[in-house]
From Swiss-Prot:
Keywords of this entry: ATP-binding, Cytoplasm, Nucleotide-binding, Protein transport, Translocase, Transport, Virulence
Protein known as: Type 3 secretion system ATPase
Catalytic reactions on record: ATP + H2O + cellular proteinSide 1 = ADP + phosphate + cellular proteinSide 2
Organism, scientific name: Pseudomonas savastanoi pv. phaseolicola (Pseudomonas syringae pv. phaseolicola)
Pfam families, per the entry: ATP-synt_ab, ATP-synt_ab_N, T3SS_ATPase_C
Binding site for ATP: G178, C179, G180, K181, T182, T183
Lineage of the species this protein comes from: Bacteria, Pseudomonadati, Pseudomonadota, Gammaproteobacteria, Pseudomonadales
Length: 449
């Protein structure tokens, strides 16, 4: 009883210390796209404000900067109905979320408010009594990140044989439209055996989102998943913030000692949303037509995933590429930040080769941490066969290839159909890791020494 009373007293004492009888407010002086200008004394970057609309409703906005004359707010929704002179009430808090098991099975918007499901949502208002954490936060210090040593099988032969993932790894899934990206994501979520799955769906079409919910997520998967969605018609602030909201939710479950899978689709649309925000804020355009804030926020986002002393976040980030080109500025930047990448090939998809994973173009930087020497040697031999076949593929199509010049190339030509058969798979039928390894060893043992 005394302990409960003491806890109650400490909680209310903290509230009283923060309480002020003076209510600071401001008024809108200008509206420039998603940016609102006003004057608010003692404001801080990152604080949320409520802006009154003409119809009596409120719009959330976040303080993003200052000039000598005014405070700059970025509207967290469409600024329709905002008038010059509209009252602004600072909430005195940054964007925070509260996370507990009630979120499992819920669909949230980019800020953590419920869209579907009987739940309170994650968004924490000024009167929220839950334990909360900030959406925009720093990553764990490098000294607090354990080494990745545990393999995380996916049930997909093309991945487990050549790009075996590790618990806590951050991987990019590079794909063009129509390459089977969404289907592969859903199957990875189903097969990877994580305690909690957090989906961040950014800039998707509304129709595709509904189809994903109805057809890709069965009831078992839904019960251990949280979905954060910001469709393409939502504001640029919501689309960009959805990535951070999903990451913060994953961090909360990791802090509870759970093994979390974070699936973020896509970093390209996140970068496009941040580009809109940067241009509206007056940032200059830099490399690839992107403002500096994009290159600042990408590492700040992806570095928050990974291992901790308590749990792990294994993160899969999709990146949209055009015409199978990896030279897109976002793709190039993301590839340098992550621990590996999986490339889906349009050419393979057009041949009906699914999953359309281009093994020779995909890589895992921590493969040696989670595989033995036998597996590594077989993986190298598989890549050697694929590279040898690619060198003579055009000659084979023209009928100009002559056998006998190189035994490795001859073997690659003979084994090509067997290799493709090994890499093809019905994703609804996951393959155990040991079975995949046995098949890989049998296949590559036919390569001459």
């Amino acid at each position: 009883m005394n302990a409960a009373l003491s806890q109650w007293k400490d909680a209310h004492a903290a509230r009283l210390r923060d309480y002020s009888a003076v209510r600071v407010s401001g008024r809108v002086s200008a509206v420039r796209g998603i940016l609102l200008e006003c004057k608010i004394p003692a404001a801080k970057v990152g604080d949320l404000c409520e802006v009154s609309k003409a119809d009596g409703s409120f719009l959330l906005a976040e303080i993003v900067g200052f000039t000598q004359e005014c405070t700059l707010l970025s509207a967290l929704g469409a600024p329709d109905g905002i008038q010059v002179g509209a009252p602004i009430r600072p909430l005195g808090i940054a964007h925070r979320i509260g996370v507990d098991d009630s979120l499992l099975g819920c669909v949230l918007d980019g800020f953590g408010r419920p869209l579907l499901g009987d739940c309170l949502g994650a968004f924490a208002g000024p009167d929220d009594r839950r334990e909360t954490l900030p959406v925009i936060a720093d990553a764990l210090p490098p000294t607090q990140r354990p080494r990745i040593t545990n393999a995380l099988p996916t049930g997909v032969r093309a991945i487990d044989s050549a790009i075996l993932l590790g618990e806590g790894q951050r991987v990019g899934l590079f794909a063009g439209a129509g390459c089977g990206k969404t289907t592969l994501m859903a199957e990875l979520a189903r097969n990877m055996g994580c305690d909690v799955i957090v989906f961040g769906l950014i800039g998707e079409r509304g129709r595709e989102l509904r189809e994903f919910l109805d057809h890709e997520l069965d009831e078992t998967l839904r019960r251990r998943s949280v979905l954060v969605c910001a469709t393409s018609d939502r504001s640029s602030m919501e689309r960009a913030r959805a990535a951070f909201t999903a990451t913060a939710i994953a961090e909360a479950f990791r802090a509870r000692g759970q093994k979390v899978l974070l699936l973020l689709d896509s970093l390209t649309r996140f970068a496009r949303a941040q580009r809109e925000i940067g241009i509206a804020s007056g940032e200059p355009l830099g490399r690839g037509g992107l403002p500096p804030s994009v290159y600042t926020l990408l590492p700040r986002l992806v570095e928050r995933a990974g291992m901790s002393e308590n749990g792990s976040i294994t993160a899969l980030y999709t990146v949209l590429i055009e015409q199978d080109s990896m030279n897109d500025p976002v793709a190039d930047e993301v590839r340098s930040l992550l621990d590996g990448h999986i490339v889906l090939s349009r050419k393979l998809a057009e041949r009906g080769h699914y999953p359309a994973i281009d093994v020779s173009a995909s890589i895992s930087r921590i493969l040696s941490n989670v595989t033995g020497r036998e597996h590594q040697r077989a993986n190298n031999r598989l890549r050697q066969l694929l590279a040898a076949y690619k060198q003579v593929e055009m000659l084979l199509r023209l009928g100009e290839y002559q056998a006998g010049a190189d035994p490795v190339t001859d073997c690659a030509v003979q084994l090509n159909d067997d290799i493709n058969e090994f890499l093809r798979q019905d994703l609804r039928e996951p393959v155990p890791l040991q079975e995949t390894l046995d098949g890989l060893l049998r296949l590559t043992s036919r390569l001459p020494e």
